[in-house]
Amino acid sequence: MENGNSSSDNKSSHKPIRCKAAVSRKAGEPLVMEEIMVAPPQPFEVRIRIICTALCHSDVTFWKLQVPPACFPRILGHEAIGVVESVGENVKEVVEGDTVLPTFMPDCGDCVDCKSHKSNLCSKFPFKVSPWMPRYDNSSRFTDLNGETLFHFLNVSSFSEYTVLDVANVVKIDSSIPPSRACLLSCGVSTGVGAAWETAKVEKGSTVVIFGLGSIGLAVAEGARLCGASRIIGVDINPTKFQVGQKFGVTEFVNSMTCEKNRVSEVINEMTDGGADYCFECVGSSSLVQEAYACCRQGWGKTITLGVDKPGSQICLDSFDVLHHGKILMGSLFGGLKAKTHIPILLKRYLSNELELDKFVTHEMKFEEINDAFQLLLEGKCIRCVLWMG
């Protein structure tokens, strides 16, 4: 790896940009709106002007986190849309003025994994929650006005008017698509829809169970609906989620708080005469992964986990059940999607009125209101809140 810190030998003709950013300086404390400096892009990098950015629960998770991989001060945010302001050397995919989606999942197009249709896990830039640029060691493109380094987040850091990304994390898109809708495919909607469409490959007429009807679970429901699932059963502790879920294709609902003596899996197995074809765990609980696995049908059932539990959490499965029941358990990161291949396909499905994105956006606010938006997310009052830059 090279040292990519900005210095006087930077060959780019572009200069540092001074702009506003919402900086997370201490765990759980309100973000600080301040002016920062954004360095020019290095080779294979792109500097973009953010048009709008959306909030994701991953932002809240790392805003709260007090142990590694948390680090401060940091610029969070990873679901956004922007316009290319400048490019570093060796960047050929995009040019100044292109509309792009930043993605936390790299798609380098060069490694064995990116060239294979079997995986979306880039081996050249393995996914990790690093505070640095992915191509260069210990390298940030952000500093505050005192010269202190500000850390990156998930290869994106969209809570800033300008940000710098590796070209592996940028997807060029049609500029005519409404920004507040297109940005959703930068993370959340792609993750859920892709889990149903690409990871699980949900079949027409199948039965799907979704644990957790937050934004990701609702996106899974949307994906299952697009795939033609005949039954989409939502499981949640909040009964009001059923009414919301119905807009996304949820056909039935199980309130896990009112199952009395029966486990949720027992209720689901009775409802489905032996188990669902596909189960999705969207909460981030190892115990729910086990429950989802118990809900899926022997012989062909698939359990897909999308949530993240605390580090070190273990999933315990009976080895007899694993051997004799022939089920599949797998993880799905970014819905198994290759960003540069699949995002344009999803955008076309939006333009053809198949993929419904409008219903995900419940709030639109100014960037300066970001702390109010965080509160809405913490209180469960929004699905997706889009923040517009000035």
Swiss-Prot record:
Localization annotation: Cytoplasm
PROSITE patterns with a match to the protein in the record: ADH_ZINC (PS00059)
Pfam family, one: ADH_zinc_N
Cofactor: Zn(2+)
MF (Gene Ontology): alcohol dehydrogenase (NAD+) activity; zinc ion binding
Enzyme Commission code(s) on record: 1.1.1.1
Binding site for NAD(+): S58, G212, L213, G214, S215, I216, G217, D236, K241, L306, G307, V308, F334, R384
Organism of derivation: Arabidopsis thaliana (Mouse-ear cress)
Lineage of source species: Eukaryota, Viridiplantae, Streptophyta, Embryophyta, Tracheophyta
Signal peptide positions (record): none
Cofactor: how bound: Binds 2 Zn(2+) ions per subunit.
PANTHER family: ALCOHOL DEHYDROGENASE, ALCOHOL DEHYDROGENASE-LIKE 7
Residues annotated for Zn(2+) 1 binding in this entry: C56, S58, H78, C187
Protein name, entry field: Alcohol dehydrogenase-like 7
Self-association state and partner proteins as the record states: Homodimer.
Binding site for an alcohol: S58, H78
